[in-house]
């Protein structure tokens, strides 16, 4: 049986590696204990510390979004499509968006076993046109690699 915490941690490490290689840096890092850290310690964090511990990945100043990572056994894309792009993580993403400091928005990066990394971005967080795999009223779902290539090429 797979430990879901270990699976989540391995997903976060994979995204950190992808981002560091893509941007030729080592500034992307996992948030210690991921989302649990800021939940447990949020009252003891200064505003600048809280800024660093947004999402699952610590991002450099040049990177404009908070990143949430989900590495799961199954992703029901049919359900996402028939629910107008909504995922089971949307409530968490909206809470994250409400607390964002110094970033444009949230990117949900998710992966099903043995598949490529996908991502969900909200249209209100992007002022540029993204070429999506799926487009919905309020969001896009696309390959994470497409988002990186688009973002880097249109910065």
Model region roles, listed by residue range:
Residues 1-155:
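Catalytic phosphate/metal-binding cores of nucleic-acid and nucleotide-processing enzymes, i.e., regions
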């Amino acid at each position: 049986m797979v430990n879901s915490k270990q699976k989540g941690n391995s997903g976060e490490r994979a995204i950190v590696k992808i981002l560091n290689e893509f941007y030729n840096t080592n500034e992307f890092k996992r948030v210690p204990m991921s989302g649990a850290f800021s939940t447990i310690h949020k009252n003891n964090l200064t505003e600048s510390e809280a800024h660093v511990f947004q999402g699952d990945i610590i991002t450099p100043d040049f990177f404009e979004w908070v990143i949430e990572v989900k590495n799961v056994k199954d992703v029901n894309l049919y359900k996402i499509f028939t629910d107008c792009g909504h995922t089971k993580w949307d409530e968490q993403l909206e809470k994250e968006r409400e607390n964002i400091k110094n970033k444009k928005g949230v990117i949900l990066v998710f992966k099903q076993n043995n598949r490529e990394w996908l991502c969900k971005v909200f249209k209100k967080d992007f002022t540029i046109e993204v070429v999506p795999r799926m487009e919905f009223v309020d969001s896009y779902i696309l390959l994470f690699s497409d988002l990186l290539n688009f973002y880097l090429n249109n910065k």
